[in-house]
């Protein structure tokens, strides 16, 4: 066995030595041949050495050839050779790969490393393949005119060289790492020749695809056709007749969009060794032009030995021009086909390569008109990348009229083009600048987006469309446009299917749960925005078939799955809150349910007895008999209207059954925006002098909702405290609710008044609107209720109110606090206790001398006269010496809490349709959709109507609709 191994090793060693000897002989033969060819070229150039012997970089021609190095690589790999200038005797280089059938097969291979050690590896080798590189020198026949004949051999620069990686010399142009696969000549130099073949054009080609179509004429091939012409022969061709490839630039690389929400950043798929793409709008195929700062050739490129204006262009193995396939638009340009499988650095990172420059914005926009579909798609994707978080680029795109081009591409027959164009529009529609939104509207962007949503079945396209509409819906003039063109489509294509609601449910099947998809989130956010536009917008949404039903079903599904903190739930609750606004005035047939006075029948019993009877609402011990308890469970004398069929559509908005849904959200959700919207919905439904508001107030008490609301007064979120305080004020119009709230909520209300002066911690500080809302709730509770006034004294509310009047720099806060103090002093039964505590009449008769919000005198037109005091006795009789301050002095109607003039001072509109258009103030969450999208974004400033939830406006009695502010960028990821 050992002898066999020794014999095998010896035979292998002998074979290796034999191969080394062959390569050595081959090397010597090639070197000898190289010298022979160099001498021939030197003799051929001697006649013109005196005038044109200096070429390329200034070196003599013989020296240039002496510097040529033949790089031989290992067997099986390519050989890197350089072409030679054309001489009267044209040379051709070839490489042949052949198999040696005489080489014995072996099952053992030995690899010798550089340090001389030998490693033995057992393999199964059937035959040995070797590569023989040869150089052939042959004469090219010349015609009568002295020009080479076409049939004499392939011209220099043709692609008969097989797999060689060569450098070819071109006339004009620049360092073309990307060459056009085919171009058509203008025909200036060969007017008498036949028309060139019609070669298909391509939007962008890979660097190595260097096939040039042979262009022949009566005079043979012209310069620049892949054949090199000697300097001495160039006079045969007029300089003005030379034709070359278009002096353009390569087309953009293939950019793959990446969703970041409602504004995305798309990164390029460029080659690792290439710079950013240069774009030329006029050509479907073009070479990359030489940068102004130099040619920037590769290190292994040789100096041009023929002409100073020539360029060395690296080529890859060719494909036959006649059989090259057409570019596939869906796969992007051919220039990216060899790179789509791997991600490469972004466009910004390619700037390190000094040879190429990034495309200019006008060039990118011009490519949107390109006849090749992949070019359009790539240009739109690159434009989306440029616009990401760049307001300047967005503004320039509008100024250069790029938005109509993108909108037109939304109806393009190619899905990829539509998708990329919509992605660019999503980023362009996000941001503080509303001019882009207006420009998209002016060029028909909203109808085009709606058409695309109806036709698209690809989920990514639907996300892009709905995200763009979400961004556009933050612009006030666009809200009704979206409703007119897209309400039905958004409802029936997205809201209803994704909510799980079925118009005709199958009794045997289980109800479907809602699907919290990105499309549903974007669509609900868009409807959340448009629902705040005004009375007409609310009417259209209420009457949209299936919308209210689907939203309520989605919320019930969220409560059932205890998934109440996501953005989709927040959007749905905000829509319900907005649609509940002024529901007692705007729904059809509301006049039939109006009441003369608020309150429920049978509430004339004494307040003290009602407080004891209903103490169990807050967990206390009941102090009433079984008969009274049964009467309470039956809503006392409440008589709910009888129905012959189930409520549907907008009727579901004000049914008592929705109270349980809102209370569940208030109990389970930890999303402050959802809490605020749910409390605002109860606030809206409990307002107004109509029968359904009476039922809602009683239902909140029956469903044990008062303790839930009182607990939320401890929230550290200002807007939640404000919404809950106003909801409690509207609920206190029910006398039973007033007694319960006065007994169990007064402590929390007073604590919030103290936080307005000296907050326990920074997050507990309340805004002016919230403080005024709390004070007006206290005023409503203590009015006509001696027991509640006593509760205020026991909670030490008087010192807090007096201090607020004396120290507050807000005239609204001081005035609201003065109203409460005067109401307390009006009860004669309490004056003795107040005087014993050191309070005098002067403390309850304060002048409104407070400063404005920042310490400046208030300019709202208020007088500084002392408010009159109102005396009340236990029976609620009015004093004959003083007039009662009517509720009208506190606001525009019986449910308002702030003077209408004061709201105008703060820049707010009066309650009603005009006030609903007030944009939300204050910081919003950090998302985008203009959150989904610059994903969906930054928090809004006071005047930025960007998307996303934000601080709601101050609500006067009735909850105002939420204007959808900017979406936070945290949701993009």
Swiss-Prot record:
ARM repeat boundaries on the chain: 349-388, 391-430, 434-468, 469-509, 527-566, 576-623, 641-681, 694-733, 734-776, 777-821
PROSITE patterns listed in its UniProt record: ARM_REPEAT (PS50176)
Protein's UniProt keywords contain Glycosyltransferase: no
Family of this protein: Belongs to the beta-catenin family.
Motif (Nuclear localization signal): 608-624
Pfam families: Arm
Protein name in the entry: Splicing regulator ARVCF
Coiled-coil boundaries: none
Encoding gene (name): Arvcf
A GO BP entry: cell-cell adhesion
Entry keyword annotation includes Cell cycle: no
Species this protein is from: Rattus norvegicus (Rat)
Tissue specificity field: Expressed in optic nerve sheath envelope (at protein level). Expressed in heart (at protein level).
Region (Disordered): 95-123, 233-254, 267-331, 593-623, 844-926
Region annotation (Required for interaction with RNA-binding proteins DDX5, HNRNPH2 and SRSF1 and with mRNAs) ranges: 771-955
Function of the molecule: Contributes to the regulation of alternative splicing of pre-mRNAs.
Basic and acidic residues biased stretches: 289-303, 872-881
Listed Polar residues bias regions: 103-115
Modified residues (Phosphothreonine): 103, 105, 637, 866
Modification Phosphoserine occurs at: 268, 333, 336, 344, 346, 607, 865
UniProtKB keywords: Cell adhesion, Cell junction, Cytoplasm, Methylation, mRNA processing, mRNA splicing, Nucleus, Phosphoprotein, Repeat
Assembly information from the UniProt record: Component of a ribonucleoprotein complex containing mRNAs and RNA-binding proteins including DDX5, HNRNPH2 and SRSF1 as well as ARVCF. Interacts (via the extreme C-terminus) with FRMPD2 (via the PDZ 2 domain). Interacts with CCDC85B.
One GO cellular component term: nucleus
UniProt-listed InterPro entries: ARM-like, ARM-type_fold, Armadillo, Plakophilin/d_Catenin
Biased composition range(s): Acidic residues: 271-281
Modified residues (Omega-N-methylarginine): 171
GO MF assignments: cadherin binding
Localization per record: Cell junction, Adherens junction; Nucleus; Cytoplasm
């Amino acid at each position: 066995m050992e002898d066999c191994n020794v014999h095998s090793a010896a035979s292998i060693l002998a074979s290796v030595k034999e191969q080394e000897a062959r390569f050595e002989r081959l090397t010597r033969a090639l070197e000898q041949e190289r010298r022979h060819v160099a001498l021939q070229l030197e003799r051929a150039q001697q006649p013109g050495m005196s005038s044109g012997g200096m070429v390329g970089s200034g070196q003599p021609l013989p020296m240039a050839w002496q510097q040529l190095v033949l790089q031989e690589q290992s067997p099986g790999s390519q050989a890197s050779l350089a072409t030679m200038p054309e001489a009267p005797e044209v040379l051709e280089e070839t490489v042949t790969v052949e198999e040696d059938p005489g080489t014995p097969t072996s099952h053992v291979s030995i690899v010798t490393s550089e340090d001389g050690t030998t490693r033995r590896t057992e393999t199964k080798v059937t035959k040995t393949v070797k590569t023989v590189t040869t150089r052939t020198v042959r004469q090219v026949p010349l015609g009568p005119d002295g020009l080479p004949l076409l049939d004499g051999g392939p011209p220099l620069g043709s692609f008969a060289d097989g797999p060689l990686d060569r450098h070819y010399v071109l006339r004009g142009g620049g360092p073309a790492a990307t060459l056009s696969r085919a171009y058509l000549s203008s025909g200036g130099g060969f007017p008498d020749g036949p028309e060139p073949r019609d070669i298909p054009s391509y939007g962008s080609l890979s660097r190595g695809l260097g096939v040039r179509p042979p262009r022949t004429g009566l005079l043979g091939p012209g310069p620049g056709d892949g054949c090199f012409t000697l300097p001495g022969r160039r006079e045969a061709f007029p300089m003005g007749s030379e034709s070359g490839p278009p002096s353009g630039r390569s087309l953009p690389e293939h950019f793959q969009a990446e969703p970041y929400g409602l504004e995305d950043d798309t990164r390029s798929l460029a080659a690792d060794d290439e710079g950013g793409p240069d774009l030329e709008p006029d050509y479907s195929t073009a070479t990359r032009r030489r940068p102004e700062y130099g040619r920037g050739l590769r290190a292994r490129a040789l100096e041009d030995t023929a002409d100073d204006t020539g360029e060395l262009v690296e080529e890859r193995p060719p494909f036959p021009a006649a059989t090259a396939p057409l570019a596939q638009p869906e796969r992007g340009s051919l220039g990216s086909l060899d790179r789509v499988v791997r991600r490469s650095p972004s466009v910004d990172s390619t700037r390190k390569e000094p040879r190429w420059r990034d495309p200019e914005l006008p060039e990118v926009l011009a490519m949107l008109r390109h006849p090749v579909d992949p070019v359009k798609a790539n240009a739109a994707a690159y434009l989306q990348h440029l616009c990401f978080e760049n307001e300047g680029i967005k503004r320039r795109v509008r100024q250069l009229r790029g938005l109509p081009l993108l909108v037109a591409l939304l109806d393009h027959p190619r899905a990829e083009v539509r998708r990329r164009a919509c992605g660019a529009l999503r980023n362009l529609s996000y941001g503080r600048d509303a001019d882009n939104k207006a420009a998209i509207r002016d060029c028909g962007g909203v109808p085009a987006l709606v058409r695309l949503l109806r036709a698209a079945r690809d989920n990514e396209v639907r996300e892009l469309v709905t995200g763009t509409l979400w961004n556009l819906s933050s612009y006030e003039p666009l809200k009704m446009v979206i409703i007119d063109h897209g309400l039905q489509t958004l409802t029936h294509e997205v809201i209803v299917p994704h909510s799980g609601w079925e118009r005709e449910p199958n009794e045997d099947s289980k109800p479907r749960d809602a699907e919290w998809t990105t499309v549903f989130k974007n669509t609900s956010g868009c409807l959340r925005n448009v629902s705040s536009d005004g009375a007409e917008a609310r009417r259209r949404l209420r009457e949209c078939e299936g919308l209210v039903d689907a939203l309520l079903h989605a919320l019930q599904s969220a409560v059932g799955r205890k998934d109440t903190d996501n953005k989709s739930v927040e959007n749905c609750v905000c829509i319900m809150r907005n649609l509940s606004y002024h529901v007692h005035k705007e729904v059809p047939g509301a006049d039939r349910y109006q009441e003369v006075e608020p309150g429920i029948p049978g509430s004339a019993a004494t307040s003290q007895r009602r407080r004891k009877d209903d103490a169990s609402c807050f967990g206390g011990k009941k102090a009433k008999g079984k008969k009274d308890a049964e009467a309470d469970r039956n809503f006392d004398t409440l008589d709910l209207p009888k129905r012959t069929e189930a409520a549907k559509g907008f009727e579901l908005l004000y049914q008592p059954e929705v109270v349980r849904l809102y209370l569940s959200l208030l109990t389970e959700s930890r999303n402050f925006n959802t809490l605020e919207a749910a409390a605002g919905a109860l606030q809206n439904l409990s307002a107004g002098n109509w029968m359904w508001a009476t039922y809602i107030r009683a239902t909140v008490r029956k469903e044990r909702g008062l303790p839930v609301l009182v607990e939320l007064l401890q929230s550290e979120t200002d807007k939640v405290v404000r919404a809950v305080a106003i909801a409690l004020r509207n609920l206190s119009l029910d006398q039973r609710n007033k007694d319960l709230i006065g007994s169990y909520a007064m402590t929390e209300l007073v604590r919030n008044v103290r936080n307005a002066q000296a907050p326990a911690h920074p997050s507990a500080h309340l805004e002016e609107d919230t403080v005024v809302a709390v004070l007006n709730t206290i005023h409503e509770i203590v009015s006509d209720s001696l027991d509640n006034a006593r509760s205020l004294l026991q909670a030490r509310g008087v010192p807090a109110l007096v201090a607020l009047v004396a120290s507050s720099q807000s005239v609204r806060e001081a005035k609201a606090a003065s109203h409460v103090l005067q109401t307390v002093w009006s009860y004669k039964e309490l004056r003795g206790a107040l005087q014993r505590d050191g309070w005098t009449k002067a403390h309850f008769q304060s002048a409104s001398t407070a400063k404005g919000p920042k310490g400046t005198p208030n300019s709202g037109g208020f007088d500084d006269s002392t408010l009159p005091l109102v005396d009340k006795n236990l029976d609620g009789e009015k004093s004959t010496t003083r007039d009662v301050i009517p509720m009208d002095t506190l606001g525009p109607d019986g449910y308002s809490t702030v003077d209408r003039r004061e709201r105008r001072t703060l820049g707010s509109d009066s309650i009603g349709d005009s006030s609903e258009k007030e944009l939300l103030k204050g910081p919003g969450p950090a998302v985008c959709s203009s959150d989904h999208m610059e994903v969906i974004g930054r928090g809004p400033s006071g005047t930025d109507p960007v998307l996303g939830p934000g601080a709601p406006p101050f609500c006067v009695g009735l909850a105002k609709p939420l204007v959808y502010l900017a979406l936070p960028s945290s949701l993009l990821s």
